[in-house]
Regions:
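Nucleotide-activated donor-binding/catalytic signature segment of Leloir-type glycosyltransferases, i.e.
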Residues: 273-296
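Short alpha-helical donor nucleotide-sugar binding micro-motif in glycosyltransferases
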Residues: 300-305
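A short, well-ordered alpha-helix in the C-terminal region of glycosyltransferases
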Residues: 370-395
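Short acidic/histidine- and often glycine-rich active-site loop of Leloir-type glycosyltransferases
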Residues: 280, 335-350
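Conserved donor-binding/catalytic core segment of Leloir-type glycosyltransferases
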Residues: 187, 235-251, 257-260
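Aromatic "clamp/platform" in nucleotide-sugar-dependent glycosyltransferases that forms part
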Residues: 313
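Short hydrophobic beta-strand element within catalytic cores of glycosyltransferases
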Residues: 330-333
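Conserved acidic donor-binding segment of nucleotide-sugar-dependent glycosyltransferases
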Residues: 345-355, 364-370
Length: 405
């Protein structure tokens, strides 16, 4: 029985954790053993779970990162115990997801991975692997990662460092360790990310592209929405413009406020994922909803919206676009990262970052010339079903193992 071990900051929690869970289910259905090693935050899983480190370890890692810019360089004991566990379960494939997040020591881990001889897969969900500090550089319009990170302009962003800038050292450490594993295969979850990886120090590693997908049995066109209007005080007689983010940092909150001042009274903007502070800042005509894990409510919100707006300034491949389309709602997005890759001209509009006038024109276009709901949904069913994507990973595992023997 082959064994798959995945490593991620979460287990069956959040988008990346659910991707690992879905891949694990496919492995199990094919007679494999599936294990997920995680740092923190989990939901019950069909895979076996192994927790890396402790809350105290995470706190120490976080504090030293804030002061010394040591992100990924602490958690030595936790990482060595993980390696002992890996030796015990002896996996055939090791699949990395997000290894940042104050829970792993990447030099210790990659020094071990370089010696195992096992096939290693690493899905890049952001840009952290090839920068000296940040997970995203689009907003800062920084391209130092192409040559050598130093004098970081984003030291105050995740993983925040308030005292030292060690971006040059971090860049060189990552380059050394991440390029030292002979059997490492990279996966980029967007074509945009794949193109940037090809310009980084990771360019010589095997690199594939697998888009993220969604569960189209969970996100569909929902007609049973009457109770939703009452629950969130959404007016029945308004056109709905929807925006969703789990974290609104650089996701266009201010742009939505500006848009509200330009929109006619026939529209109501609904924003999901807001903090208490943001809720207090909302003008008339904007309904705010806190972050919710209620998938049924999210499905209904997508379904009642006339248009889904993704005014993100920094993104890789947002699955909210997929969720909206699966629920029959056209998407308008800024041209940020891979955000446009799930759209076609028939079901979405791509506009320049910050172009609120173009956003306004696109909203009016879709409001008065609705896109057929089934056209939006069928595009996602055909191209971005999560089951399809998980099977692509499993096919890759089998290919790597066949060449490894």
């Amino acid at each position: 029985m082959p064994t798959l071990l995945q490593i991620n900051i979460t287990a069956n929690w959040g988008s990346h954790g659910k991707i690992a869970e879905g891949i694990g289910k496919i492995a199990l259905s094919n007679g494999w053993r599936s294990i997920i090693a995680y740092g923190r935050w989990y939901n019950p899983s069909q895979s076996e779970l192994y927790q890396i480190g402790s809350i105290r370890d995470e706190q120490i890692h976080g504090v030293t990162s804030r002061i010394m810019d040591n992100h990924g360089l602490m958690s030595r004991g936790a990482t060595r115990r993980l390696i002992d566990y890996i030796e015990t379960v002896n996996p055939d494939i090791i699949h990395l997801h997000n290894i940042h997040g104050y829970y792993l020591n990447y030099p210790i881990l990659f020094d071990y991975l370089a010696k195992t001889g096992k096939p290693i897969v690493w899905t890049l969900h952001d840009c952290w692997a090839y920068t000296g500090h940040c997970a995203h550089y689009m907003f800062a319009r920084c391209d130092k990662w192409k040559t050598l990170c130093q004098h970081c302009p984003q030291r105050d962003t995740y993983p925040k460092s308030i005292l030292l800038d060690r971006s040059k050292r971090n860049y060189l450490l990552k380059k050394h360790y991440f390029c030292s594993v002979p059997n490492l295969t990279l996966i980029a979850v967007s074509q945009w990310l794949q193109n940037d990886v090809k310009q980084s120090f990771l360019k010589d590693l095997p690199l594939y592209h697998i888009h993220n997908g969604i569960d189209t049995n969970t996100f569909y066109i929902d007609r049973d929405t009457d109770g939703l209007y009452t629950k969130y005080n959404i007016p029945h007689d308004k056109r709905i413009v929807l925006g969703v983010a789990s974290n609104w940092f650089r996701k266009g909150f201010e742009d939505f406020i500006q848009l509200r001042h330009m929109l006619d009274d026939e529209y109501t903007i609904v924003l999901v994922g807001l903090t208490d502070k943001m809720l207090k800042q909302l003008p008339t005509g904007v309904i705010g909803i806190k972050r919710t894990q209620n998938v049924a409510d999210m499905r209904k919100l997508y379904s009642i919206a006339d248009v889904y707006m993704n005014l993100t300034w920094e993104d890789n491949f947002p699955t909210t676009n997929l969720e909206a389309l699966a629920c029959g709602t056209p998407v308008i997005t800024y041209d940020s990262g891979g955000s446009s890759e799930s759209l076609t001209e028939q079901i979405g509009k791509v506009i320049d970052q910050g172009d609120i006038s173009a956003a306004l024109d696109s909203i009016r276009l879709y409001s008065h010339n609705p896109v057929p709901e089934e056209l939006c949904r069928q595009h996602i069913v055909d191209n971005f079903n999560s089951e399809q994507k998980f099977h692509e990973y499993f096919k890759l595992y089998c290919s790597l193992l066949s060449h490894h023997k």
